[in-house]
Amino acid sequence: MILKYDVIVIGGGHAGCEAAAAAARMGAKTCLVTMDMNKLAQMSCNPAVGGIAKGQIVREIDALGGKMGLVTDATSIQFRMLNRGKGPAVWSPRAQCDRGKFIWEWRTQLDRTDNLDIWQDEACELIVENGEAVGVETVWGVTLRAKAVVITAGTFLNGLMHVGKRKVPGGRCAEPAVLHFTESITRHGITAARMKTGTPVRIDRRSVHFEDMEEQPGETDYHGFSYMTAPRHLEQLPCWTTYTNKEVHDTLRASIADSPLYNGQIKSTGPRYCPSIETKLMTFPDKNQHPLFLEPEGEDTNEMYLNGFSSSMPMEVQLEALKKIPAFRDIRVYRPGYAIEYDYFDPTQLKPSLESKLVSGLFFAGQVNGTTGYEEAGGQGQMAGVNAALYCGGSAPFVLKRDEAYIGVLIDDLTTKGVDEPYRMFTSRAEYRILLRQDNADARLTEKAYELGIASRERYDHWLKKKTEIERIVRYCDQTNVKPRDINDALERFGTTPMQFGTTIASLVARPQLSLEQLASAIPTLQEALLTNDARQAEIVEAAEILIKYKGYIERERLVAEKMHRLEDIHIKGHFNYAELHEISTEGRQKLTRINPETLGQASRIPGVSPSDINVLLVLMKR
């Protein structure tokens, strides 16, 4: 049987679901190929979305018309805004989700998407003709033909799970690996390598002594991830915290020779920022305890996730160690922790559009590009799906710059620097994080998305209304003066210096001790100005306050970004044979040849390419 589409997406994880939905919204006839339609966007590890920098990515996906934010809001069971004690540049939303409901909400979203079919099958052969990806063959003998193919296979390509000395092929617990698809990709010159990740035990809550743990409730100030979600009261479930102890550590150390990570059984690299419990013990031998977080998997299940105890130690060792923790003395588990090795592909062989440099019309997104995390996968999937659809129509690709989105930072890092370990996004990776806040993803991206065709008119109108209200509040604060006699008593109550002369409300908001809400309690006209008929009034006021309070920082960072744009506007791909440019350092020639950057800006970010190398290229381009 032959089925014909514009875009085929291989893999129904977080990257694949966003890619398929995005391509279909662009008008491309799309097919999502997945081995299990009942596990779409499965949360293979922790049942949570967001976190530091990751929450910003989810809001960006939403601002671009993607689905992850909507699905998260519909299935949240706890919410927290991380980094509240720091500046808004690094505020990051995080939600615990109901794992089962998350899958079915994604299924509902995809079922309602026009131009999208789902095919339950396994891709086994990539079809390439004349250097172009034109489809795939499946294990059921179906030929799927298309103009573009997006690979989002997660950890399933030659996946191998480890628990102690036991090794089981699989892409996830009790799910088969895809064993031959990698070879059909690498025969076209695409480089594959291996990475490793892991996950902890899943615990039966009925066996936990919660009286020996500390409750960690959510925040009452609930922010939705989606700009389209109406504010609501969130019934929240608590998480719980406890710690390992010396007995736990002694038990694990006594069996370290049975750990696949330390006996040579696993040779691939795991995520630096999500280490296994055995790695923590070996890396930090002086620490007497490590924190553990017990997270609910859903409202209607007894299954709980033990964050902080990822392990591939033998099953009995994991259980013996956990029973040394008072809260887990009678522990029962649903399954052990395990490590998994899998194939990924060198992301420096991709264009900034996530299209392969070697096979036209072939796109990659998610963990197959060497990243880790649902959010990083979803962001890549969104961009790969959009660009696959644009490719089908012969249009120029859609690429986000580093000052436009964390997604832009992510993809630029992957395609420019490559990876030697699973890549995780942090706010520290973004040099323009004051511009890339979680509150303004819609301001940065929704208009672009609407013009491109991936954001609806409803979403665009929603943003325009919000923009008008924010600008009105900022303008009012800039133009309205207050006199010392009208405000000084309140300023003293708020713990800030009284005024000697009249000033604008905006200059008062700029004080670190003051907020719009505080000032509104003392200035009746400001209280009236903050009132809107928008359901998300609190979000609008917060956005206006950030723009006022951090105006100088925002303007300064924007100027720096605009200077960098000059290098981004100088396209150098195809202009040089770098091997012949002896004015450039040997390492610089080698790296430039391998990456073959699109712009001078991208070239400047390649490790090993020096500023003097960039100056040489700049002089040559001016000639």
Regions picked out by a protein language model, each given a short descriptive name:
Residues 2-15:
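Beta1/beta-strand and adjacent pyrophosphate-binding region of the FAD-binding site
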Residues 3-5, 139-148:
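Core beta-strand elements of the Rossmann-like FAD/NAD(P) dinucleotide-binding domain
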Residues 10, 143-154:
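Short hydrophobic core segments
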Residues 21-125, 129, 140, 152-172, ...:
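Conserved N-terminal/central alpha/beta ligand/cofactor-binding core
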Residues 36-38, 54, 182-319, 411, ...:
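An anion/pyrophosphate-binding glycine-rich loop and adjacent beta-alpha core
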Residues 305-371, 398-412, 537-591, 596:
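A glycine-rich dinucleotide-binding beta-alpha-beta segment and adjacent secondary-structure elements
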Residues 377-398:
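Internal hydrophobic alpha-helix adjacent to the cofactor/substrate pocket in enzyme cavities
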Residues 429, 446-615, 619-623:
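Extended, charge-enriched "interface" segments that sit outside catalytic cores
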